[in-house]
Amino acid sequence: MNKIYSLKYSAATGGLIAVSELAKRVSGKTNRKLVATMLSLAVAGTVNAANIDISNVWARDYLDLAQNKGIFQPGATDVTITLKNGDKFSFHNLSIPDFSGAAASGAATAIGGSYSVTVAHNKKNPQAAETQVYAQSSYRVVDRRNSNDFEIQRLNKFVVETVGATPAETNPTTYSDALERYGIVTSDGSKKIIGFRAGSGGTSFINGESKISTNSAYSHDLLSASLFEVTQWDSYGMMIYKNDKTFRNLEIFGDSGSGAYLYDNKLEKWVLVGTTHGIASVNGDQLTWITKYNDKLVSELKDTYSHKINLNGNNVTIKNTDITLHQNNADTTGTQEKITKDKDIVFTNGGDVLFKDNLDFGSGGIIFDEGHEYNINGQGFTFKGAGIDIGKESIVNWNALYSSDDVLHKIGPGTLNVQKKQGANIKIGEGNVILNEEGTFNNIYLASGNGKVILNKDNSLGNDQYAGIFFTKRGGTLDLNGHNQTFTRIAATDDGTTITNSDTTKEAVLAINNEDSYIYHGNINGNIKLTHNINSQDKKTNAKLILDGSVNTKNDVEVSNASLTMQGHATEHAIFRSSANHCSLVFLCGTDWVTVLKETESSYNKKFNSDYKSNNQQTSFDQPDWKTGVFKFDTLHLNNADFSISRNANVEGNISANKSAITIGDKNVYIDNLAGKNITNNGFDFKQTISTNLSIGETKFTGGITAHNSQIAIGDQAVVTLNGATFLDNTPISIDKGAKVIAQNSMFTTKGIDISGELTMMGIPEQNSKTVTPGLHYAADGFRLSGGNANFIARNMASVTGNIYADDAATITLGQPETETPTISSAYQAWAETLLYGFDTAYRGAITAPKATVSMNNAIWHLNSQSSINRLETKDSMVRFTGDNGKFTTLTVNNLTIDDSAFVLRANLAQADQLVVNKSLSGKNNLLLVDFIEKNGNSNGLNIDLVSAPKGTAVDVFKATTRSIGFSDVTPVIEQKNDTDKATWTLIGYKSVANADAAKKATLLMSGGYKAFLAEVNNLNKRMGDLRDINGESGAWARIISGTGSAGGGFSDNYTHVQVGADNKHELDGLDLFTGVTMTYTDSHAGSDAFSGETKSVGAGLYASAMFESGAYIDLIGKYVHHDNEYTATFAGLGTRDYSSHSWYAGAEVGYRYHVTDSAWIEPQAELVYGAVSGKQFSWKDQGMNLTMKDKDFNPLIGRTGVDVGKSFSGKDWKVTARAGLGYQFDLFANGETVLRDASGEKRIKGEKDGRMLMNVGLNAEIRDNLRFGLEFEKSAFGKYNVDNAINANFRYSF
């Protein structure tokens, strides 16, 4: 308000108006009488010039709220602030209004288009509202209407920086109606009308009895907010409110015209209910009068400046002040109307508009309604005016020019499709603007966050360092639409800016090529590849691109010879004064009020460590509120580059680096001192001032890293989740104190890993599943733990290899309780068994950590070198001593606690691995196992110490047990004794016996050659039998056989056997002789609970069949088969073996077909097959013991006798022969011998003979004269190995 206002009744306005107490013929006494008369209120003298109460609220909170800064973002809910007494203040749980409609002076509020509202008496003070500034645009008042001091103003341009405040759509007549529409339930449970006001009057800060005067009014820096309660709804057409007693900002001179907002429960949004009129003091409380929003008055002014033209699909021509409407687009004289300058032309229902002259609409613009298409043609003529307003879902195809000496303002949610180069600047507040020409506009200004620029041609932006596009407060969107775009810098002032590519089929490259430090505050998303490449032979460390907004793309990011930083953004706050204090002479000007304010709040800032609240800086390195930047991409490619992730950044994506430095959790952060204010020069220039300092906050990275000749540093408060495979070649990595790295995928490094923080290595969790695949982790130079806070963890199906070194009291954790161990993915069960030995975690390496603590739970440690530990605690775990070249190993522990665990030590006849405990050994239910890597039968007389511990150690800490090693059960003989200085567990001998179960499993595996031979034998004679059934001729044939078999010991197999061949018929005296050749392929799979694998076989053979006229026949066949085998065994540590073998076959069958009738027969038969099966041998080590398993070459001889019966059925054009058979197959020779050898000796297992009953049924059919088809089912029974089911299908084509 202008100075201090009293209230006076006005006959002209029909209500109260505010009149300066300094005005002529008005006195405080006169005013008091008027107020007492009209309002029945007692006004106690003049109102004190006091407004912002900072006794319990920081000054900055009032300013942040009005300027929508800090936590007070539009729409924010559950907002609370901390008061200076430490209490919380919640604003009655109201959401935060959008105050962007407030002009910079605070004395007027935009309501959309070219209109704003204020109070009429502000006209006396041009600073208040005669010229209104929004962001970088200034607007002049060109006309007004007012009533009861409420004033609606028309501006010379459409306001692009804001869509404006939403006006109240209704004016309740009573308080109860208003309470229903605008009331909210307050924190005390009562329903009240609570609202906000934003203005910038003559600001003073009150702290108790002291006052800090700013001597400033209408300053945008000091735009502040009030929280109020409406106490009277209607008083001479106005409402009355009082300020909140805690968040207390009393209106003062200069606040006149500022907007008052209430939450509309029906619309569910904040609405502008009026403008601030005047103040009065009643019983010591200040009351504020709000002149209500006058929708009728607003509509009258808008109607005055609107010229509506219904095109209805037709066209109009505009020349000078004449507008001519042509019906049905006919180019004839039509209806003419006069255009009044400064009026808005409102087009409806679509159509064409043709300019036939240069048009200057003054403060008038062109408005297009919703949902239609318009074509604007200019024939080289220009338009100039307030701007263009396009309704929702309307398209305006702009083929005219805008005047180059003015700036086009575009608002409305519709689309402006610009088809011609304009040679002018544009400011965009809402909707889409499509650019179809190179350099369509000289410069583009985007504001409010509601506008979008769409590129529809290469180079459609400018060619300067900013590409001629500027994003002011809340910015807007640039859609590359499949076009590449290069910037030196993007002129964006906040995260309201978004650069996207909506073309899902064509990637757009966004290149940012700054060679000096630059911060981009906006967002990047869509189908975009981001690059920051500097053309240089050397790395340009000054070419630092800093992203503190967000990236969300499935494409790559590329950086070469430059630096890239991803970080959060220090939240901007209000400042008290942006300009410097121009008076440095304290004795003349007094102490600068900004300094006084800072000193006033210093004690509270010291208490709460909150100097940043009073330092007159919009951002500070020490402030706690940083916006988290989220950055998602596919792969970041670094070449001779630096990449850092600083505080409050969350990065997701893979990294591929070459000769680069990667820092995750970088302490160096960057602040743009002009953030939010970067855009200058009426909106078409950009300034940035960057400060850098140290500031630590949480940093996250999720992805995998591949790096060559690079370096990686993980800093304090960084959380790194390596869920992608990580391969580091000649790339050291360090993990600082306070950092956490979680490797959820395999990790390999040719260097070491330095750990001062925490490293966790795990298996690979499967997406959308609770199962886990084992993860492999390997560090060639080991893991180096530094300091007492270093933490090394391996769990959740992790297999880790690499020595561990710790120089202090670090913590090393291996495994986790069995109850927490996840399910292993079914596809990796066998692999997990090999890697983890049935434990949760496996570790291979030595641990040198004389001050550290190692904890093992459900883990196995393969100890392969000398190790020393301060404290070792194990549960449900195993420590297994291993080593190369027969070297024995010693584990030295100061304090050892073991429960339900096992120690496996190796021993020969003279030496052994040793466990040395210096201070304490305790525990129960533990096994002491011995791997005998050298034995010579039962042996006594050994004297080898395995464990030594302090004197008095309980004798039952360990117990010896029998171990299955190789094909033997070995039992160590261990003597426990307590000498004068120590307790020892000494190996004095061992006993070994054959392990029948291991031998059985080995024999079952080695019998695979015999079973493969048998499968081939069963299929040898199939072809010759077919020839007898079909009275065949010379021809070609094919057969496929699929079957399954089983044997004792859980053995089962399945196979698919394919035969192809051709034969020739020779008609001789008294017999038919068939000779032929065959090729075969067999794919078989076999397994048991002890092994599994497959055999692929290929073979070739010759056969002959002589069929005598008497019914007798003789079949002969010879065949060779080559086998490729791969089997994995789970016994005796055999693992997976690949080997080749072969076999020979020679078979003869004789029989006689006796015809019972012409179509039925009985056929007794006998077969003998002799063969050769190659042997095989495997040699390996199990737990240090040398093992050999082999079977020799052997020659099977297999006989078969049986009888077949059959009958033929025929018709005119068909014939089918059905048959059934029953036989017995038997071994004449025993199959091969298996030899097993381990350190306890040799075991020979003789082969056995087997026999089985064979059964089959089948048929052969003549499909055509020269085409035959056969099908047969068979199985066997009563053998040690049986064919459970087999099906045989064959085809023959006769020549």
From Swiss-Prot:
Catalytic residue positions: H121, D149, S256
GO terms, molecular function: endopeptidase activity; serine-type peptidase activity
The protein's Enzyme Commission number: 3.4.21.-
Activity control note: Inhibited by phenylmethylsulfonyl fluoride and Pefabloc.
Impact when changing D729N: In strain: Nissle 1917
GO terms under cellular component: cell outer membrane; cell surface; extracellular region; periplasmic space
Protein role: Shows serine protease activity and displays cytophatic activity, including elongation, rounding, and detachment of a proportion of the cells from monolayer in culture. Triggers vacuolation within the cytoplasm of the human bladder and kidney cells.
CDD domains with a match to the protein in the record: PL1_Passenger_AT
Enzyme class of the recorded protein, top EC level: hydrolase
Top-rank taxon, per record: Bacteria
Site, Cleavage: residue positions: N1018, N1019
Any single biological process term in GO: proteolysis
Cytoplasm as UniProt keyword: no
Reported effect, D352N: In strain: Nissle 1917
Effect of Y612H: In strain: Nissle 1917
UniProt keywords, alphabetically: Cell outer membrane, Hydrolase, Membrane, Periplasm, Protease, Secreted, Serine protease, Signal, Transmembrane, Transmembrane beta strand, Virulence, Zymogen
Autotransporter domain mapped to chain residues: 1029-1295
All residue ranges annotated as the Peptidase S6 domain in the record: 51-300
Biological source species: Escherichia coli O6:H1 (strain CFT073 / ATCC 700928 / UPEC)
Signal peptide positions on this chain: 1-49
UniProt remark on domains: The signal peptide, cleaved at the inner membrane, guides the autotransporter protein to the periplasmic space. Then, insertion of the C-terminal translocator domain in the outer membrane forms a hydrophilic pore for the translocation of the passenger domain to the bacterial cell surface, with subsequent cleavage.
Post-translational modification: Cleaved to release the mature protein from the outer membrane.
Name of this protein: Serine protease sat autotransporter
